[in-house]
């Protein structure tokens, strides 16, 4: 535990420098109070409360991530479903071009990927590295998601990233997915 620093009036907990290493930036405080933290933590009640207070479900944080990106990455299905039903843009992109489908695919959340696709998410969207959601799923060896994405868009197999790699080129060694992703 951090030790309080003495102030002119003695030990003082409320002084900004009272506790070493326990300071938050305004940006961090905005994140904690905003919809992003609630989505990240799967706090559906808080997400609903913030949406009812007219918070935009597609409002990005300072890094360009929306609540749907955070909920998708962390596997919070109910939060994703509520955000989509509340008008969240399923193909909103971060500063690096990632969509919620990229995040769900990379993290192995098949049911969330299915939910996003059912709400119109485009699996052919590429991030700044030229990677599709199929590249992201293949990179981590998520076979169920690879199959799901190919059902929606078989042409994904032929898309190369900026380094000219196909999704099958990113498979982990000894992957059973090579046959699925190779033409």
Swiss-Prot record:
Q: ANK repeat positions in this chain?
A: 30-59, 63-92, 96-125, 129-158
> Which keywords does this chain's UniProt record carry?
ANK repeat, Phosphoprotein, Repeat
Q: Which InterPro entries match?
A: Ankyrin_rpt, Ankyrin_rpt-contain_sf
Q: Which SMART domains match?
A: ANK
According to the UniProt record, list the residues that bear Phosphoserine.
153
Q: Does the keyword Oxidoreductase apply?
A: no
Q: Which Pfam families match?
A: Ank_2, Ank_4
- The organism's place on the tree of life at top rank: Eukaryota
TM ranges are none
Q: Which family, according to UniProt?
A: Belongs to the ANKRD39 family.
User: Per its record, how is this protein called by name?
Assistant: Ankyrin repeat domain-containing protein 39
Identify the taxonomic lineage of the organism of origin: Eukaryota, Metazoa, Chordata, Craniata, Vertebrata
UniProt gene name? ANKRD39
């Amino acid at each position: 535990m951090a030790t309080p620093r003495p102030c002119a009036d003695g030990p003082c907990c409320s002084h900004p420098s009272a506790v070493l290493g326990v300071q938050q930036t305004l940006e961090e405080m905005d994140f904690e109070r905003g919809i992003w933290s609630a989505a990240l933590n799967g706090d559906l009640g808080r997400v609903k409360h913030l949406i009812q207070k007219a918070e935009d479900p597609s409002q990005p944080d300072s890094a360009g991530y929306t609540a749907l990106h955070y909920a998708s990455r962390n596997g919070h299905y109910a939060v994703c479903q509520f955000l989509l039903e509340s008008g969240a843009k399923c193909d909103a992109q971060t500063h690096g071009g990632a969509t919620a489908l990229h995040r769900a695919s990379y993290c192995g959340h098949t049911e969330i990927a299915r939910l996003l696709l059912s709400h119109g998410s485009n699996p052919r969207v590429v991030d700044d590295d030229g990677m599709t959601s199929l590249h992201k799923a293949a990179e981590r060896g998520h076979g169920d998601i690879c199959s799901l994405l190919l059902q929606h868009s078989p042409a994904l197999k032929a898309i190369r990233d900026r380094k000219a790699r196909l999704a099958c080129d990113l498979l982990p060694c000894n992957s059973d997915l090579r046959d699925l992703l190779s033409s």
